Amino acid sequence: MENIKASTEQLCAEANIQRKKVSEVSKELLDFCEKNKTNDMLVSGPTDQHNPFQEKKSCSVL
């Protein structure tokens, strides 16, 4: 009986979720990505100042 009650509550919660069409959401996602691409390290790459993988420059005296 407890199982059925939990399933019913889960189904009610899922029924109340607001759904949108994929065509609308994909347009919003593209707009968001275009708007924020300058701050996205995966799109723009790290700057020289904030690149933890850049080789450290050292001075060697000969």
UniProtKB/Swiss-Prot annotation:
SMART domains: G_gamma, GGL. GO terms for cellular component: heterotrimeric G-protein complex. It comes from the Eukaryota. Its main location: membrane. The modification Cysteine methyl ester is found at C59. The lineage of its organism: Eukaryota, Metazoa, Ecdysozoa, Nematoda, Chromadorea. Residues 53-62 have a biased composition (Basic and acidic residues). GO terms for molecular function: G-protein beta-subunit binding. G proteins are composed of 3 units, alpha, beta and gamma. Interacts with gpb-1 and gpb-2. Coiled coil: none annotated. Guanine nucleotide-binding proteins (G proteins) are involved as a modulator or transducer in various transmembrane signaling systems. The beta and gamma chains are required for the GTPase activity, for replacement of GDP by GTP, and for G protein-effector interaction. It is a lipid-anchor. Transmembrane segments: none annotated. Gene3D superfamilies: Transducin (heterotrimeric G protein), gamma chain. A lipid is attached at C59 (S-geranylgeranyl cysteine). It comes from Caenorhabditis elegans. It is found in: Cell membrane. This is Guanine nucleotide-binding protein subunit gamma.
